[in-house]
Regions:
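A short, N-terminal "cap"/entry segment at the start of jelly-roll beta-barrel domains
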Residues: 1-86
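Short, surface-exposed beta-strand-loop junctions and turns on beta-sheet-rich folds
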Residues: 109-111, 155-156
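A short hydrophobic beta-strand segment most commonly corresponding to one strand
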Residues: 154-170
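Conserved metal-binding segment of the jelly-roll/cupin
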Residues: 132-152
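An anionic, turn-rich surface loop/hairpin at beta-sheet edges
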Residues: 112-134
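Short, conserved beta-strand element in jelly-roll/cupin
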Residues: 88-103, 107-109, 115-121
């Protein structure tokens, strides 16, 4: 995929105005309304590009689709199992676009280390619950919940992630 094609896909991902029925701009004093729409074919086309990046990198690739006040959307492609992680400051809503994986949630991170403010990673999870994920599934992971994606050998998993700011209260 050349640079022009990549830019065209990004433009279609971000320039979503006018796709939503029932959301029109009005001339009143309320805050402007908007609606962003990313079709499954456009997301899968972009995921194909990320899959190429993942092959030449560490086996996973992701990028921010769009940032909003209080949350952001990311496109993520996995060619291998991910590290276990805990995000203290945001919840995640995963929409599975393509593939299968096992999601482990809960339990405790093993060999944990800090990667940034409110973010920790680890080698794996001990004592978590396993769930099988498939294309079309929607998953909510609360802030502070350890989680990890495990893939079978030579499988690909693509998802849209909505990260939502959420304080964890003790």
């Amino acid at each position: 995929m050349d640079r022009m094609q990549k830019d065209d896909i990004l433009e279609r991902l971000v320039a979503a105005e006018g796709f939503c029925v029932g959301h029109s701009r009005s001339e009143d004093t309320r805050a402007p309304q908007s609606c962003d729409h990313w079709s499954n074919p456009v997301l899968l086309e972009r995921a194909a590009y990320l899959r190429k990046l993942a092959r030449f990198g560490e086996g996973n690739a992701s990028e921010v689709v769009k940032e909003y006040p209080g949350y952001c959307t990311l496109l993520s492609v996995h060619l291998r199992s991910s590290d276990a992680e805990v995000n203290e400051e945001f919840a995640e809503l995963l929409i599975v676009l393509d593939g299968r994986a096992t999601l482990i949630t809960g339990g405790e991170l093993q060999k944990a280390y800090r990667i940034g403010p409110g973010e920790h990673r680890g080698a794996n999870i001990s004592g978590g619950t396993m769930q099988e994920l498939r294309t079309g599934d929607v998953i909510h992971i609360s802030a502070g919940t350890p989680h990890q994606l495990q893939l079978a050998c030579e499988k690909t998993f693509s998802c849209l992630i909505v990260q939502i700011a959420q304080a964890v209260h003790p």
